Structure formats: C-alpha cells, structure tokens
Amino acid sequence: MKTLLVIKDDCLNSLMAVNWAKRELKEFEIVDINESPEVAMVYGVVDIPTLLKVNQHGMVDRVSGYNADLYNKLMEDGING
C-alpha cells in the first residue's frame, strides 16, 4: 500500500503535515496540488493537507484529513453497492 500526502506547497498547514509525515511514516510520497491540480478536483483538497492510502490496484483505500468522513463513506458505498 502506498501513502500519498496531498499538499499545497505554500501553505503552513502543508509544511506541518510534511514534518509530521517525516516523523511518523516510513514511506510516503508528496503530491503538490499546484503541480497536479486534478488531485484537488478529485479529492477536494484545497488548503488542508490530506493523507491518502492507495492499494496495489491504484484504488484509494483510506483517506485522512479534510472531508475524510465523506470520502470514506463514498468509497464504502461504492464497495457495498
């Protein structure tokens, strides 16, 4: 499973999230919404960092951060039909 930290590079919250991830996570990749604006459109990430867990099939398995409850419910509804 891959962990993605979605940030906005000029945001103080993002700096704090990156520092937290460096301390707490073994491996993660940073996705800057300024470089990948489609991520912001898909996940609604604007100014608040969001942590995504992506499985081996490229599907988002878990979401933490902004609107996490909404995304997790949408994913659960999609899985359970």
Task: Describe the residue ranges of each PLM region.
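Local sequence-structure signature of Cys/Sec-based thiol-disulfide redox active-site neighborhoods
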Residues: 1-24
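Generic leucine side-chain signal with a strong bias for well-ordered alpha-helical environments
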Residues: 4-5, 51-52, 74
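Thiol-based oxidoreductase modules, predominantly thioredoxin-like and allied folds used
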Residues: 6-8, 25-39, 47
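Short alpha-helical
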Residues: 12-13, 35, 69
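Alpha-helical elements of the RecA-like P-loop NTPase motor core of helicases
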Residues: 15, 19, 41, 61
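CheY-like receiver
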Residues: 39-43, 74
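Structural micro-motif
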Residues: 43-52
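Non-catalytic, surface beta->alpha helical segment in thiol-disulfide oxidoreductase systems
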Residues: 54-81
